[in-house]
Amino acid sequence: MSRTNFDTLLEAGCHFGHLKRKWNPSMAPYIFMERNGIHIIDLHKTVAKVDEAADALKQIAKSGKKVLFVATKKQAKQVVAEKAASVNMPYVIERWPGGMLTNFPTIRKAVKKMATIDKLTNDGTYSNLSKREVLQISRQRAKLEKNLGSIADLTRLPSALFVIDVLKENIAVREANRLGIPVFAIVDTNSDPSNVDFVIPANDDATKSVEVILDACCGAIAEGLEERKAEKVDMEAAGENAPKGAGKKKNTKARMDKAEEEAINAAKAAAFLKEDEEA
């Protein structure tokens, strides 16, 4: 059964492309006709491509991997944030940080810095700092949250990218191509689909168009996550019924002395302040 249909896509305006003079010839296979100087996308092909992409996304989610959603254009930001968050997937809607994929370890350091600042807040280290120092660290935390907060749970490279408007997000697409990360994308008639692995030909400028396609794709991701959860429950049940081992592993992790931990936290706070002054 198809995850969407012609009428739903038509009502959402998914068929409206760009002006003929702005078209990319590589999108010719997905164009149905021209009307009043505007290209009309073949929605029958869009339905098929949505199903194809959704099936692949379901398998990625079922395997426990992450899909990174990218949409920095105004019309798509809010809906992408809502849909991606609903299936616990990371997303970028503010500005694509250069090297987000190709220099991922550096991005992870910035994300870890947020966690460290949160720890300083919770363990009382802030009480030993001046108001000015607290303000500096808080501003640094807010800046990191704005740009990287939505990818805080991304501990490794994503297994796929889902892009809204490959023309605008060309840097993200190039980075994914360079690393061999599959790219799923809503591609309008003015864009080049050649660097996209799963092309969904549709209007990428209308919020409603983006929303109906994300509904289908995120619905598939949700199914994959549910199936993974069910498989885990079955495996745990099977493990409980199996013969238990003789001994249990002991937790040998050493605990840090409180005074030493406070000293380290104070040093980290000082490091944040130094970075802020140098910046």
Curated annotation (Swiss-Prot):
Family annotation (InterPro entries): Ribosomal_uS2, Ribosomal_uS2_bac/mit/plastid, Ribosomal_uS2_CS, Ribosomal_uS2_flav_dom_sf
GO molecular function, one term: structural constituent of ribosome
Coiled-coil residues: none
GO cellular component, one term: cytosolic small ribosomal subunit
GO biological process: translation
Family note: Belongs to the universal ribosomal protein uS2 family.
Identification of the protein by name: Small ribosomal subunit protein uS2
Organism: Phocaeicola vulgatus (strain ATCC 8482 / DSM 1447 / JCM 5826 / CCUG 4940 / NBRC 14291 / NCTC 11154) (Bacteroides vulgatus)
Lineage of the organism: Bacteria, Pseudomonadati, Bacteroidota, Bacteroidia, Bacteroidales
Encoding gene (name): rpsB
